[in-house]
Amino acid sequence: MFTFALLLLCVQGCLIQNVYGQCCGCGCGGGCGCGCYGGEGDGNVNVCGELPVCGETLVCGRVPICGGVCFKGPACASGCVSICGRCCGCGCGGCGGCGCGCGGCGCGCGGCGGCGCGRRCCCC
């Protein structure tokens, strides 16, 4: 039992070093080259609950999301944002055909950006 507890403690220490290494630029080694300096994920990432993000988040590639995505407040995006599924809570799929006026970007332009709001939303 003691061996298992010691192993679990070591694993937790490695996880803490990885987290602090990505935030601070160095791990517990204090800049001596012993820390983790970021990384790239490969595989599945599951998030249950809230995922607060402050600042800028750059995502290159695809992020598949199975389930619902809810935004509270502004969700600003530069570049192209494609949302497949339902863009708004009315169930129309973001096409604006239900009369709710969501049109994909919230201003009723249909997501084409022709209204001058500067936001584009491609809903498929």
UniProtKB/Swiss-Prot annotation:
Keywords: Repeat, Signal. The keyword Signal applies. Residues 1-21 form the signal peptide. Transmembrane segments: none annotated. Residues 84-124 are annotated as: Right arm (Gly- and Cys-rich tandem repeats). Residues 22-35 are annotated as: Left arm. Residues 36-83 are annotated as: Central domain. Belongs to the chorion protein family. This protein is one of many from the eggshell of the silk moth. This is Chorion class high-cysteine HCA protein 12. It comes from Bombyx mori (Silk moth).
